[in-house]
From Swiss-Prot:
PANTHER family: GLUTAMYL-TRNA(GLN) AMIDOTRANSFERASE SUBUNIT C, MITOCHONDRIAL. NCBIfam families: gatC. InterPro entries: Asp/Glu-ADT_sf_sub_c, GatC. It catalyses: L-glutamyl-tRNA(Gln) + L-glutamine + ATP + H2O = L-glutaminyl-tRNA(Gln) + L-glutamate + ADP + phosphate + H(+); L-aspartyl-tRNA(Asn) + L-glutamine + ATP + H2O = L-asparaginyl-tRNA(Asn) + L-glutamate + ADP + phosphate + 2 H(+). Heterotrimer of A, B and C subunits. This is Aspartyl/glutamyl-tRNA(Asn/Gln) amidotransferase subunit C. Its EC number is 6.3.5.-. Signal peptide: none annotated.
Length: 95
């Protein structure tokens, strides 16, 4: 499929990008190349081929969805200038 300059201008307008008139022939050529490649992909026989999301058959490691405190409260509060009763203590902001 061949894209003419007027179609390239319209695509640029729809995409909300500014393209100089001098650059429209190059844009038309690039769009034509993309569409030619897509036409080649449409010719590939994919009958019986399962869709895939990755080239490697990997699964994510799963863990139990359990709420914990992280067992790091003491380490985290050690960085605080003032901590009381297991919480950060901050100066009063609103009277």
């Amino acid at each position: 499929m061949s894209i003419d300059i007027e179609t390239a201008r319209r695509v640029a307008h729809l995409a909300r990008i500014r393209v100089d008139e001098a650059d429209l022939p190059a844009l038309a050529g690039e769009l034509s190349g993309i569409l030619t490649f897509m036409e080649q992909l449409n010719e590939v026989d994919v009958e019986g081929v399962e869709p895939m999301t990755s080239v490697t058959p990997m699964r994510l490691k799963r863990r139990q969805d359990v709420v914990t405190d992280g067992d790091m409260q003491d380490k985290v509060l050690a960085n605080a200038p003032d901590a009381r009763e297991g919480f950060f203590a901050v100066p009063k902001v609103v009277e």
